[in-house]
């Protein structure tokens, strides 16, 4: 049986309903109900809040195939055509698979600039509070700054998110928003003066690489295949071919129609 987890949030429940529509014999349940089932063969969830992360970890632990949905790598997500990334058995698509360029050419919004090698500032983009909880990386920023300072004399700028809710847990252990982080947001990135972006799993890596700014990321990042994951190598960035990875990423996000007509699931299952 395929179980699809409710998000209990009006803005995101439509993605769940589209998944149910596109997956024959699937059923929508509350997260706490899914993890009690005995006949689950596949699970689907959107995001990690309001109990959905419990389904993710439960499926992972029990070796049940799961499909994780979230905001896309690029494209309109809150209006038609409603792009959403969908990843089988992972949080994001952090690997490369050979794909044609058709979906990329149809939807990619940015020009791809040549690699830029004359920047000055290192811009550090920490994981959100939700991602710190989900991946257990509360000390990521401290560890990252320590490594960078030991290996470079370049200026290091830490970019704070404009929206970064404080995360707690409900009585079932699901992540919930418990407050607001009042840290003021940082100014926009000065791309002309940027030497490199250092981040955990943020999608800023995609924009940066299209602008020709090299990235240093954790393995839990969609641009990890074209980024350096060893932060001690901050003075030797990777300048590698980008387009094939973007083609691959384009086959990891889908429209509402593609969720509903089954195309997304057939691609993810290799059919």
Describe the predicted segments one by one.
Residues 78-119, 225-271:
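Leloir-type glycosyltransferase catalytic cores
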Residues 117-170:
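Conserved catalytic-core segment of nucleotide-activated headgroup transferases in glycan assembly
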Residues 14, 27-79:
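Extended catalytic core of nucleotide-activated donor transferases of GT-like folds
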Residues 30-37, 51, 149, 154-215:
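Donor nucleotide-activated moiety binding/catalytic core segment of transferases
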Residues 46, 68-70, 159, 200, ...:
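Generic beta-sheet signal
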Residues 1-42, 53, 130-131, 266-271:
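N-terminal pre-catalytic "stem/leader" segment of glycosyltransferase-like enzymes
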Residues 4-10, 41-42, 44-50, 70-71, 121, 125-128, 195-196, ...:
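Structural motif
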